[in-house]
Amino acid sequence: MVLKTVGVAGTLESSDAMITVEPANQGGIVIDISSSVKRQFGRQIEETVLNTIKELGVENANVKVVDKGALNYALIARTKAAVYRAAESNDYKF
């Protein structure tokens, strides 16, 4: 999937996350995580977001995750929504 613009999904409410995905020309997928539980769950958050992005076929992207205690299913849903918005795609594969 080719990213065309910046895609954002989520909120900064408790138990949610805000995911921002933007295109990158090269460098693979770079993930920046901001979370109060990063020391405890940072690796799992990164793994979940990275696997979801790769599953959608994205090869180069800059991703910012602002986590407020989101569970995995919320991270996956928010990441998919942000990627589809960044790709300006309506061809959802749920």
Curated annotation (Swiss-Prot):
InterPro entries: CitD, Mal_deCO2ase/Cit_lyase_ACP
Protein name, per record: Citrate lyase acyl carrier protein
Lineage, broadest ranks: Bacteria, Fusobacteriati, Fusobacteriota, Fusobacteriia, Fusobacteriales
Keyword hit for Phosphoprotein: yes
Physiological role: Covalent carrier of the coenzyme of citrate lyase.
NCBIfam families on file: citD, PRK13253.1
Subcellular localization: Cytoplasm
The family this protein is said to belong to: Belongs to the CitD family.
GO CC annotations on file: cytoplasm
Subunit structure: Oligomer with a subunit composition of (alpha,beta,gamma)6.
